[in-house]
């Protein structure tokens, strides 16, 4: 998409889990074939029958599925997404249909990149997509979501669509001599000036309604990971502003249609590092009661720069894709070991006690088609 996409990808780059454990590769874990095409900044979900669906992002409008219950597991292409190519959407299964919320993309070849607030759903039985007659209360990009039950999904976080959209409008309108000024002015602001979304929304697919369920107990984030287990919600890290992460993990209990916030926690520093920068685009999921968080990316030193008053906190810092894995064991976060390679911005899907890491972006910023998994087994973290 020319210079506009170049700036968009730069923006996505910037935004954009003590137990004694052993890291091994294991024959116990399920082995899945690579996705038919590399995938980063995509989305995915699993249905109640053990079928995983992934698509969008660098796959364009393509979607694929794989049945985990079949003896011979292969990816199959399903009907293409009708809403246009987009990145950073969120998807969940509700009422046996795949719902896709928001994202960022171009409506046509001439339009600027923009945040979407639309919703689509896919019927596995009919192999058809349908645009849902609703729009989200705010634009949804950099948001995160978790399924609450068969009819409701919780969605929170994400960028401010007006500020985000204006950046790309300004970049497109600027000549070459002005672009660096536009970029600097956009990034050189305190976190509060980006107005990342901190409202928690509940969408009810049966009633096709949205509900305000309150606000996050701290700052809004973008690029956070989220998981739900036994009615406990975990919102993991994310960006406070472009280039600046947080190491905070929000925890809440969902009970009687009400969200009650509990005490926050923090990821520990990586071995050899003085502080935890926090992660955006990390993989996450539960295995045998242990919450595992791995991969993602950050800008080492950005947090200290921001503390020192430098608002363009990641200026001049190379983005670092992470390979560390952390685990929440008996209420305490611990460093568990390393992934096969640094990776972030892929799709996390849990099935039983396996957490599948599908696609992602490698340390060169390129999308990958690999599928790996985390599993806790007999006190060991198994990586397949």
Swiss-Prot record:
Its main location: periplasm. The active site is at 239 (proton acceptor). GO terms for molecular function: racemase and epimerase activity, acting on carbohydrates and derivatives. It is found in: Periplasm. Residues 1-29 form the signal peptide. Keywords: Carbohydrate metabolism, Isomerase, Kelch repeat, Periplasm, Repeat, Signal. It catalyses: N-acetyl-alpha-neuraminate = N-acetyl-beta-neuraminate. Kelch repeats lie at residues 51-95, 97-149, 151-184, 185-230, 233-282, 304-353, 355-384. It holds the Pfam family NANM. The keyword Signal applies. InterPro entries: Kelch-typ_b-propeller (IPR015915), NANM (IPR056734), NanM_proteobact (IPR019936). Homodimer. This is N-acetylneuraminate epimerase. It comes from Salmonella enteritidis PT4 (strain P125109). The lineage of its organism: Bacteria, Pseudomonadati, Pseudomonadota, Gammaproteobacteria, Enterobacterales.
């Amino acid at each position: 998409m020319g210079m506009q996409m170049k700036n968009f990808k730069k923006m996505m780059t910037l935004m954009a889990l003590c137990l004694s454990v052993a890291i091994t590769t294991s024959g116990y874990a399920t082995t899945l074939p690579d996705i038919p095409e590399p995938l980063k900044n995509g989305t995915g979900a699993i249905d109640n029958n053990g079928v995983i669906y992934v698509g969008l992002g660098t796959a364009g409008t393509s979607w694929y599925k794989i049945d985990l219950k079949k003896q011979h597991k292969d990816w199959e292409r399903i009907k293409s997404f009708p809403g246009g190519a987009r990145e950073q959407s969120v998807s969940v299964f509700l009422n046996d249909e795949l719902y896709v919320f928001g994202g960022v993309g171009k409506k046509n070849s001439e339009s600027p990149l923009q945040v979407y607030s639309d919703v689509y759903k896919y019927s596995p039985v009919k192999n058809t997509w349908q645009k849902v007659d609703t729009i989200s209360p705010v634009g949804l990009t950099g948001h995160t979501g978790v399924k609450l039950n068969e009819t409701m999904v919780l969605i929170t976080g994400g960028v401010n669509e007006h500020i985000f959209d204006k950046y790309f409008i300004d970049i497109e309108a600027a000549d070459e001599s002005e672009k660096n000024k536009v970029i600097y002015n956009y990034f050189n602001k305190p976190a509060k000036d980006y107005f990342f979304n901190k409202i928690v929304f509940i969408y009810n697919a049966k009633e096709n309604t949205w509900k305000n369920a309150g606000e996050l107990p701290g700052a809004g984030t973008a690029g956070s990971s989220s998981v739900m287990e036994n009615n406990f919600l975990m919102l993991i890290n994310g960006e406070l502003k472009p280039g600046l992460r947080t190491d905070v993990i929000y925890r809440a209990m969902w009970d009687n249609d009400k969200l009650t916030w509990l005490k926050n926690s923090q990821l520990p520093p990586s071995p050899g590092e003085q502080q935890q920068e926090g992660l955006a685009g990390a993989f996450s999921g539960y295995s045998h009661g242990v919450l595992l968080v791995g991969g993602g990316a950050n800008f080492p030193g950005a947090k200290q720069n921001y503390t020192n008053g430098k608002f363009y906190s990641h200026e001049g810092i190379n983005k670092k894709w992470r390979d560390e894995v952390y685990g929440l064991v008996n209420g305490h976060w611990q460093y568990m070991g390393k992934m096969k390679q640094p990776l972030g911005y892929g799709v996390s899907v849990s099935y039983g006690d396996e957490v599948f890491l599908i696609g992602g972006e490698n340390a060169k910023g390129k999308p990958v088609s690999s599928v790996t998994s985390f599993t806790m087994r007999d006190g060991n973290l198994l990586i397949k």
